[in-house]
Regions:
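Low-complexity intrinsically disordered segments
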Residues: 8, 17-19, 31
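Short, small-residue-biased leader/transition segments that mark boundaries at the very start
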Residues: 1-9
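Long, contiguous binding/interaction regions
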Residues: 23, 30-38, 42-79, 83-197
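Nucleotide-activated sugar donor-binding and catalytic core shared by glycosyltransferases
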Residues: 15-16, 156
């Protein structure tokens, strides 16, 4: 992160208390944390399970900001992370509906406590003339990795929470961004908070 972003910022937890953490920490920091929920879902790794979960959101008009899914340490079980905005009441409704699906084993709202969140972004940027040194400088500031180099481009890999990735994109001249892909967020509870069978 740029040095100016290391100022202490308040963090709100689900219990309504707030603490101060530095922006550089990997604890999720969001302006409306209570409205942005990260749901972690264990479900059976079967054909159609993903489409039924997504269909539930669509049928009831719930929005999905990001979605990631992959097998867990048990290959018969997948873990899905859904980021969805909504009031606590709406998220409670979503959780109840998800728990009614046969394939769903367990649902946890990670935003009800402390958790770590990460997202991966690959961005191809123009790197010619003065832009080349500027892109290298920004990559270093945001602790990225240059994973591909040509005489005209850099491909940069960045990981962090969505605020960090958004801050990088704002720092780069839009005309320099040639292509970008993001994975969506995944999260895990801190300390003894675990989601398993």
């Amino acid at each position: 992160y740029p040095v100016s972003l290391h100022d202490a910022l308040p963090i709100c937890l689900a219990d309504g208390k707030s603490r101060t953490r530095t922006y550089g920490n990997d604890l999720r920091l969001g302006e409306n944390l209570m409205n942005r929920h990260v749901l972690s879902i264990l479900l059976e790794n079967e054909p159609g399970a993903l489409s039924r979960v997504v269909g539930l959101f669509s049928a009831r008009g719930y929005n999905i900001e990001s979605l990631t899914v992959a097998p867990t340490e048990d290959p018969t079980v997948s873990r899905m992370t859904i980021v969805s905005p909504g009031s606590p009441e709406i998220i409670e409704q979503i959780t109840k509906h998800l728990n009614r699906l046969i394939e769903v084993i367990k649902v946890v709202d990670l935003t009800e406590g402390e958790y770590a969140e990460r997202e991966l972004m690959l961005v191809k940027v123009r790197a010619v003339g003065k832009d080349r040194e500027e892109m290298k400088r920004l990559n270093d500031i945001f602790r990225g990795r240059i994973i591909d180099v040509t005489d005209k481009t850099y491909t940069i890999e960045l990981t962090g929470n969505s605020d960090k990735l958004d801050a990088f994109l704002k720092a780069v001249d839009k005309e320099c961004i040639l292509e970008m892909v993001r994975t969506g967020s995944c999260g895990i509870g801190r300390g003894d908070r675990m989601l398993h069978l």
